[in-house]
From Swiss-Prot:
Protein name per Swiss-Prot or TrEMBL: NAC transcription factor NAM-2
UniProt keyword annotations, A-Z: DNA-binding, Nucleus, Transcription, Transcription regulation
Biological process terms in GO annotation: regulation of DNA-templated transcription; system development
Species of the source: Hordeum vulgare subsp. vulgare (Domesticated barley)
UniProt domain NAC: residue ranges: 28-193
Keyword DNA-binding: yes
Length: 402
């Protein structure tokens, strides 16, 4: 009865959370990362693991690292994205030695540099652990191929640990595995080193791909034109060729039309010139000054002056024989814009030149014929132009001296 009263009067037992299950992944709040310092790894995880004290959180898996290759370890980790943490035992390479066995499945781990001490952050700054860096090599030593896989190995350095690991245990009736055990637990961090040059090349490649995609997005008509051409003509280039052919046809049609218009305008201008010359001869002598603003109109009656008198140059023969034809610079122009050409048989035929600057006839003695066109010449340039070798032309029926 009393026991029941005492039991009833005692406080109810507090509810304690169950210990975390081994191997279950922890649930961290968003934004939290497991990135402990070297001291935290040794003091709060490795020390407690060696003393068999419950850990704050089950976030580090127990794996024998030397039975796997490093690229197989990420899938065996409990937690991690770019780096992975493991508790692993460490064995001796020889039964009577203190050298650890670093052999793995398809390679080996090789230590780089010397061990670095891990100091506590308290006032005493005591040494709590040792950190060693190792690199994984493919193949067999000493001709292994170096890889980018790195391991940081953390070990304890307290008196009991150093005494236990400095000398091999006595060989008794136990198993051989127990005799080779160097450390029950070491904490290892595994990660793959990123090559900066390769990362830069990959970044540039991604930027180039993005720029190409942006260019295609910015200019969709070209892609649409190619797709349309492929469906209509059966080829990606059919639409472009069709567009080019139509452009050339339009260009040639416009050129021929402009040339025909220029010839018609030239013939009409010659008619107006002859009529104006017969009706009211100009009192002065001027050079040809066609309109520069009208395209393809070489002779405009409103802007063309009257041809000057024929001038005689010493030693210059106006009549020359070219082949079977005799060209005379004093040929009569019967009608508007016609010139007489003697073909050697005495029969003269009227020819309508398309332009006033007809093709010159050259010989070995005199320079090429020049026709002065454009704006009115300055007085100082008139003398130089008159002294050049030119074929003067006379128009019959025109009274030059009123």
């Amino acid at each position: 009865m009393g026991s029941s009263d005492s039991s009833s009067g005692s406080a109810p037992p507090r509810h304690q959370p169950p210990p975390p299950q081994q191997g279950s992944a922890p649930e961290l709040p968003p934004g939290f990362r497991f990135h402990p310092t070297d001291e935290e790894l040794v003091v709060h995880y490795l020390k407690k693991k060696a003393a068999k004290v419950p850990l704050p959180v089950t976030i580090i898996a127990e794996v024998d690292l030397y039975k796997f290759d490093p690229w197989e370890l990420p899938e065996k980790a409990t937690f991690g994205e770019q780096e992975w943490y493991f508790f692993s035992p460490r064995d001796r390479k020889y039964p009577n030695g203190a050298r650890p066995n670093r052999a793995a499945t398809s390679g080996y781990w090789k230590a780089t540099g010397t061990d670095k001490p891990i100091l506590a952050s308290g006032c005493g700054r005591e040494k709590v652990g040792v950190k060693x860096a190792l690199v994984f090599y493919r193949g067999k030593p000493p001709k292994g191929l170096k890889t980018n896989w790195i391991m940081h190995e953390y070990r304890l350095t307290d008196a009991s640990s150093s005494a236990a690991t400095s000398r091999p245990p006595p060989v008794t009736g136990g198993s051989r595995a127990a005799s080779l055990r160097l450390d029950d637990w070491v904490l290892c961090r595994i990660y793959k080193k990123i090559n900066k040059a390769a990362a830069a090349d990959q970044q540039r490649s991604m930027e180039c791909e993005d720029s190409v995609e942006d260019a295609v997005t910015a200019y969709p008509p070209y892609a649409t034109a190619c797709m349309t051409g492929e469906g209509a003509h059966g080829s990606n280039y059919a639409s472009l060729l069709h567009h080019q052919d139509s452009h050339e046809d339009n260009f040639l049609d416009g050129l021929l039309t402009a040339e025909d218009a220029g010839l018609s305008a030239g013939a009409t201008s010659l008619s107006h010139l002859a009529a104006a010359a017969r009706g009211s001869p100009a009192p002065t002598k001027q050079f040809l000054a066609p309109s520069s603003s009208t395209q393809f109109n070489w002779l405009d009656a409103s802007t063309v002056g009257i041809l000057p008198h024929a001038r005689n140059f010493p030693g210059f023969n106006r009549s020359r024989n070219v082949g079977n034809m005799s060209l005379s610079s004093t040929a009569d122009m019967a009608g508007a814009g016609t010139c007489a050409v003697d073909n050697g048989g005495g029969n003269a035929m009227n020819v309508m030149p398309p332009f006033m600057n007809h093709l010159p006839v050259q010989d070995g003695t005199y320079h090429q014929q020049h026709v002065i066109l454009g704006a009115p010449l300055a007085p100082e340039a008139t003398g130089a132009a008159a002294s050049a070798f030119q074929h003067p032309v006379q128009i019959s029926g025109v009274n030059w001296n009123p």
